[in-house]
A protein has these predicted regions:
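Extracytoplasmic beta-strand/coil segments of soluble accessory domains associated
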Residues: 37-80
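Short, acidic, small-residue-rich periplasmic hinge/interaction motif at the N-terminus
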Residues: 1-29, 66
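Gram-negative outer-membrane beta-barrel transporters
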Residues: 384-389, 480-485, 504-591, 663
Length: 666
């Protein structure tokens, strides 16, 4: 007889009323070719907007924009201060040990400005005894190569780890170009048929190197010191649009990035209190070059853009338990951004030539050199008067530059409706603010220093449950409803002067439902099955006033935000064999504020399927793994962004080796 077990463990005080999604380590370490953009696409309800394979990928929660998503790495915010967003294609999933999503109001516990939510990324000590090593080699379609190496050492006090990922590919996949038509003629040159040509992705090559160094020291007396340093060297061509004409040899379209992120940490833990201090530094150098052959065989630079970002970071946090029912937390953080951006548009004029005989009379040079300090402080009180009931009050204050936002309050409550099945009801309410980014204010041309801060109220309620039967199965799930009214939403729109400029929309109403479920079962001693699914309904409607008589955006869904999204993944294991299937779906997205259903005004819905087969071998001297993956299993033709081609069916193969040196991992 299988005995049913009631699960009602004492939940962490920090999680009272919080809507959070945590990713399993199996998901994060699926294969070395994946970025966090891939992880979020197939394992969460948030929307990932990708400009192509190995190109810019941003995420947005609950019908908000990418700049409404805050991202932290080991406690330090890593959103680009110029753009306000994060490129998740540049974050290897093998560099992340712990990842979670804080939805909506829950993000206020970590940072302000996350009108949609917050992505929390971190690394953790490996708990290694002695020396350890892991090497993985991957090879895939389009001459793609992926390599991963990790070296580890650990003892009673020290944990040291070095990880490196190198990825490269010509990235010249084939696709059907629906933006062009080829004609078939008869003998009299009459058009008798037309077809969409098969083309290759042009100017899409990339070479990315990531190195992560970690050092941890644990005194064994309640103190732990840590150093995390992550270096990125990226060289990526920017693929031509499906509408671009001309020969590939006539263009060079390239983006380069060098970024160093580093965090020093100290954690001091006692029985009923804890103090943490962190200091960090981020340096980013970005370069964009667009060159074109003018017909004389010399590649002339048309656009040359250089940006440097230096960020200094400090944070201090404290926790104090008055009792097992009452917790006080407080924290303060500072980010000092120094940004230098220089753009040159090099125009040609025959009346004034340089040494190559190319004109420079009408060169256009625009730049800005700005600094801004961002301060944030918070205090929270979490109270659990009885085991079933928990309440949390959070107050947060923020200053950007010399401007203070009004106090950001948030209130959370949860209540266990039934111990049987651990059925819990949650509710929360918060006010939130987001300051304009540096590009919003100062970018030339188009920056708007007169922008207002975005502000709004968010309401949320939901249910969750979890059941278990003695090592046989676990079943858990949650459903939540949210309603968010945002004033002065910032959006970049075209102007009559020929460039884009940000403006404030008077009011946006984002609301909807999120559902998530997980199921794991041990069929017998050898067979195991795990299932995970998510669904989101996220209308995001412009409810402001028309800006002109021709404005057709009022009452319409905001651009590039799907109303529906869903994911499903299943993992079946038999001894050392593993089979993984992943599926995701995004509904129709509009490219215009008017929601015009024209050829270029909307992107059709699409679904994606990937499948992976894996086999592990345990030898006397090493553990080996072989893994094969099929991406886009059904060869779906789709677009995530207008005129940005995406790959069809493609394949990857990985071989991994972990030598058995010294003691095994605990």
């Amino acid at each position: 007889v299988i005995r049913e077990v009631e699960i009602l463990g004492k939940r962490p005080m920090k999680d009272i009323g919080v809507q959070q999604t945590r990713f399993d380590s199996l998901v994060l370490k699926e294969n070395i070719a994946l970025s966090m953009a891939d992880i979020l696409t197939f394992n969460s309800s948030i929307f990932v907007k990708s400009y192509g394979r190995a190109t810019l990928s941003t995420v947005s929660f609950r019908g908000t924009s990418a700049s409404h998503t805050q991202v932290t790495w080991n406690g330090m915010r890593i959103n680009n201060p110029m753009l306000g967003m994060t490129d998740f294609s540049m974050i290897p999933s093998y560099f992340i040990d712990d990842a979670s999503l804080l939805h909506g109001t829950s993000s206020v516990n970590m940072a302000g400005g996350g009108l949609g939510g917050l992505v929390k990324l971190s690394t953790v000590p490996a708990h290694q005894e002695g020396f350890g090593m892991q090497y993985v080699q991957g090879i895939g379609s389009f001459s793609t190569f992926d390599e991963f190496l990790q070296l580890k050492y650990g003892d009673k006090h020290w944990q040291i780890s070095t990880r490196a990922v190198y990825q490269s590919s010509p990235n010249d996949y084939k696709y059907r170009n629906h933006d062009k038509k080829e004609n078939i003629y008869d003998d009299k040159y009459n058009i008798i048929e037309q077809y969409y040509p098969i083309e290759r992705n042009r100017s899409g090559a990339y070479k990315d190197l990531h190195i992560l160094q970690e050092v941890y020291y644990n005194t064994g007396k309640g103190d732990r010191f840590g150093l995390n340093a992550w270096y990125t060297d990226s060289n990526r061509e920017l693929a031509l649009l499906t509408t671009d004409q001309g020969d590939l040899m006539d263009f060079e379209n390239r983006q380069r990035e060098h970024t160093l992120r580093s965090v020093l940490s100290w954690d001091h833990t006692r029985e009923n209190w804890k103090v943490s201090a962190r200091g960090g530094y981020v340096h980013t150098w970005l370069a964009y070059d667009y060159k074109r052959d003018l017909g004389n065989g010399i590649m002339a630079t048309m656009t040359r853009s250089r940006s440097k970002v230096n960020t200094f970071y400090g944070q201090l946090d404290g926790e104090y338990f008055f009792s097992d029912k009452l917790l006080l937390t407080a924290g303060v953080s500072a980010h000092q951004h120094l940004v230098n951006s220089l753009d040159k548009d090099l125009n040609k004029d025959d009346n004034k030539n340089d040494k190559y005989g190319q004109g420079r009379k009408n060169d256009s040079i625009v730049y800005f050199d700005k600094g801004r300090i961002e301060l944030s402080g918070n205090v929270s009180l979490k109270w659990q008067p009885v085991n079933r009931l928990g309440m949390s009050l959070v107050l947060r204050g923020e200053m950007f530059g010399t401007k203070w936002a009004p106090v950001i309050p948030a209130f959370f409550v949860d209540y266990v409706l039934s111990k049987r099945g651990n059925i819990m009801a949650k509710a929360s309410i918060t006010r939130n603010y987001r300051f304009p980014t540096l590009n919003d204010l100062y970018f030339l041309p188009g920056g708007n220093p007169a922008l207002n801060n975005e502000s709004g109220f968010t309401y949320e309620t939901g249910l969750s449950f979890s059941v278990d039967k003695d090592n046989v199965y676990t079943l858990s799930g949650s459903a939540s409803w949210f309603d968010q009214h945002i004033n002065d939403w910032i959006i970049w729109l075209p102007t009559s002067k020929g460039f884009y400029s940000p403006v404030n929309l008077k009011k946006v109403h984002a609301y909807g439902v999120e559902v998530q479920a997980d199921y794991a079962v041990a069929i017998d001693k050898a067979w195991k099955l795990g299932l995970n699914g998510t669904f989101a309904w996220t209308p995001s409607i412009n409810e402001g006033e028309p800006t002109s008589k021709a404005d057709q955006s009022v009452g319409k869904q905001l651009p590039y935000i799907p109303e529906y999204s869903a994911t499903l993944s299943g993992r079946l294991t038999y001894r050392s064999w593993g089979l993984l299937y992943k599926w995701c779906y995004y509904s129709e997205r509009y490219t215009m504020t008017s929601n015009a259903v024209s050829y270029t005004g909307h992107l059709p819905p699409y679904l994606m399927s990937n499948v992976t087969l894996e086999k592990g071998f345990s030898l006397r001297w090493a553990d080996l793994s072989l893994k094969g993956t099929v991406n886009n299993l059904f060869d779906e033709e789709y677009l995530s962004v207008l005129s940005r081609p995406m790959p069809g069916i493609n394949f990857e193969f990985f071989i991994g080796i972990t030598p058995k040196w010294g003691k095994k991992k605990k």
